[in-house]
C-alpha cells in the first residue's frame, strides 16, 4: 500500500493479521494486489478471515466485516439525532408535511431483494460443507478434514445473531459431509504444533482460508439486498445501519407490522449514486449474512 498509494492523501485503516507468510505477488494493478493479499490474510480473532480492501470518501480499509461490525455497530451513547440518521422506514405514501419531509430524508423509497437460494448450486459448490485433504510433501503426511458451516457460523461475528437459510434437517439430508465437494491442497509447511524444520516456515492457514472465506462470502452475498433512499444521508461502505422494514402484506392493507427477521442492523457493502435532473438517489447494498 505504501509503495503504490504513496500519492494518496487518504489514510488506511488496517485490521491486524495473524501468522507470517512469504508471498510472491504477480504483476497486478495496485488494487488487485491488495485484493490478492486480502485472500491470503488470516485472523485468529475474527474467524471468517474474510478480509476486504475498499475505499470510501474518507479513507481506505483493509479488514474483515467482523472488524467493522465490532467497531461500528454500537449505537449506545449516540444522540437521537445521530441515531435517527441510521434508521430507515419503508413508506408507501408521501407525507408532504414539514415533519413528514424530514422523515422522508430517512425513508426507503424502494427495496430490491437479490437472488434466491439455489440448493443445487449450494450442494455442488460446498456452501455448507467441504472436504479437504492436505498433502504435506516435505513430511510425507496426509491430513483429511471436514468443514461444516452449520457448526461454525455462530462463531462468525455479524451485525446480529443469524439463522441458517435452510433447516438443519434439510442440510443433513441433502448436503451430507460424505457427498460434499472434495479438494486436495499441496502444502510445504508443518501443521500446527509440528516442528518448522530446516525451512523455518510457519503454518500458512491454507485450510482455513479455502473453507471459511468462500462459505461466509457466499452467505453474505446471498442475503444481501438493495435499498434506495434520497441522497441526503452520509453513508459509506463499512458503516453499520439500523433498518426498520415492515411486512409488505400488512403495508398494502394499511397496517404496519415489523418484519422481525429482516429488520435490524446491516452492514453497508456498496453504494451507487445516481443523479437524474435535480434528483439524487442512493442505491445501497446491505447485508447481515442471513436472517435474524
Regions found by a protein language model. Give the residues of each.
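Generic low-polarity alpha-helical segments
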Residues: 1, 60-62, 227, 243
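Glycine-rich, acidic and aromatic/proline-enriched surface loops and short helix-turn segments
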Residues: 1-11
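Short amphipathic alpha-helical segments, especially helix-boundary/capping motifs
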Residues: 9-14, 214-215
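Short beta-strand-centered interaction patches in the first periplasmic/extracellular domains
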Residues: 12-112, 116-120, 127
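An acidic/polar, Gly/Ser/Thr-rich interaction patch typically located in mid-to-C-terminal regions
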Residues: 80, 84-292
Amino acid at each position: 500500500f505504501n509503495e503504490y498509494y504513496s500519492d494518496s492523501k487518504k489514510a488506511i485503516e488496517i485490521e491486524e493479521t495473524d501468522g507470517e507468510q512469504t508471498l510472491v505477488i504477480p504483476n497486478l494493478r495496485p488494487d488487485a494486489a491488495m485484493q490478492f493479499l486480502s485472500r491470503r490474510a488470516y485472523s485468529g480473532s475474527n474467524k471468517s478471515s474474510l478480509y476486504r480492501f475498499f475505499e470510501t470518501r474518507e479513507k481506505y480499509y483493509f479488514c474483515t466485516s467482523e472488524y467493522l461490525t465490532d467497531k461500528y455497530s454500537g449505537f449506545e451513547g449516540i444522540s437521537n439525532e445521530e441515531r435517527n440518521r441510521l434508521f430507515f422506514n419503508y413508506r408507501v405514501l408521501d407525507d408532504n408535511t414539514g415533519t413528514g419531509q424530514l422523515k422522508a430524508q430517512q425513508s426507503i423509497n424502494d427495496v430490491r431483494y437479490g437472488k434466491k437460494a439455489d440448493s443445487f448450486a449450494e450442494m455442488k459448490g460446498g456452501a455448507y460443507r467441504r472436504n479437504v485433504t492436505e498433502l504435506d510433501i516435505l513430511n510425507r503426511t496426509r491430513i483429511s478434514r471436514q468443514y461444516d458451516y452449520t457448526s461454525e457460523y455462530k462463531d462468525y461475528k455479524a451485525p446480529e445473531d443469524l439463522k441458517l437459510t435452510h433447516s438443519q434437517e434439510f442440510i443433513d439430508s441433502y448436503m451430507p459431509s460424505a457427498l460434499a465437494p472434495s479438494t486436495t491442497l499441496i502444502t510445504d509447511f508443518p501443521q500446527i504444533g509440528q516442528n518448522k524444520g530446516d525451512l523455518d516456515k510457519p503454518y500458512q492457514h491454507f485450510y482455513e482460508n479455502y473453507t471459511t472465506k468462500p462459505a461466509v462470502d457466499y452467505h453474505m452475498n446471498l442475503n444481501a439486498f438493495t435499498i434506495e433512499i434520497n441522497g441526503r444521508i452520509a453513508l459509506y461502505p463499512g458503516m453499520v445501519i439500523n433498518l426498520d422494514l415492515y411486512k409488505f402484506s400488512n403495508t398494502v392493507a394499511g397496517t404496519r407490522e415489523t418484519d422481525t427477521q429482516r429488520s435490524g442492523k446491516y452492514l453497508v457493502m456498496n453504494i451507487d449514486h445516481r443523479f437524474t435532473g435535480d434528483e439524487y438517489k442512493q442505491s445501497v447494498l446491505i447485508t447481515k449474512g442471513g436472517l435474524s
